[in-house]
């Protein structure tokens, strides 16, 4: 029974009963009238006809309205859901990178590689080579000797230098190794892009103040790695042979 409606027996019109049942034609019967309706089918049929007559005149009981409304089904045609279109294009970069969880890149560790030689801009440098550095302030050249090479993790090449100090005999327009003195060593390396190659390691060391023997050659020396650039005094063949 729907909520809020009190049942009423179709035969005896009572509204109190320990148990309610429905007859063969859907009428409501109390517990006392249930046995009578089963024994006398004719009486049940007449009772049901009287119910229909009493409820006639274009009005239906609330029970029957509720029972019919529960059986109503929508007859409106529903078109089947269209299939989802599958994109045939390639997947974008955002989809590719989101497939996996992002991983934090490891911190870069500074690694330094030292070597005794280095190839830079078509020139093969070695330890002991002489280079030239131009000062930005006065524009004068300063000479130094390479004592080591350094390369970092970004392939940036540098060189550790030992400065060469000129003397009064050092020419101003060219480099003469025999007239320079070995100076202080520089602590920090300099980039190779600021260095200009002069010559490879000379055949002899630079001029030494404490050397007991003269370092300046008495006569022209030939067949060495370096030699003077410029005119040399003419020497007789006999002197060179002797």
Curated annotation (Swiss-Prot):
<keyword id="KW-0862">Zinc</keyword>
<dbReference type="GO" id="GO:0008270">
    <property type="term" value="F:zinc ion binding"/>
</dbReference>
<comment type="function">
    <text>Component of some chromatin complex recruited to chromatin sites methylated 'Lys-4' of histone H3 (H3K4me), with a preference for trimethylated form (H3K4me3).</text>
</comment>
<keyword id="KW-0539">Nucleus</keyword>
<dbReference type="InterPro" id="IPR039050">
    <property type="entry name" value="GATAD1"/>
</dbReference>
<dbReference type="GO" id="GO:0043565">
    <property type="term" value="F:sequence-specific DNA binding"/>
</dbReference>
<dbReference type="GO" id="GO:0006325">
    <property type="term" value="P:chromatin organization"/>
</dbReference>
<dbReference type="GO" id="GO:0031674">
    <property type="term" value="C:I band"/>
</dbReference>
<keyword id="KW-0479">Metal-binding</keyword>
<protein>
    <recommendedName>
        <fullName>GATA zinc finger domain-containing protein 1</fullName>
    </recommendedName>
</protein>
<feature type="region of interest" description="Disordered">
    <location>
        <begin position="44"/>
        <end position="85"/>
    </location>
</feature>
<dbReference type="InterPro" id="IPR000679">
    <property type="entry name" value="Znf_GATA"/>
</dbReference>
<feature type="compositionally biased region" description="Low complexity">
    <location>
        <begin position="45"/>
        <end position="54"/>
    </location>
</feature>
<feature type="zinc finger region" description="GATA-type">
    <location>
        <begin position="9"/>
        <end position="33"/>
    </location>
</feature>
<dbReference type="GO" id="GO:0006355">
    <property type="term" value="P:regulation of DNA-templated transcription"/>
</dbReference>
<dbReference type="GO" id="GO:0005634">
    <property type="term" value="C:nucleus"/>
</dbReference>
<keyword id="KW-0863">Zinc-finger</keyword>
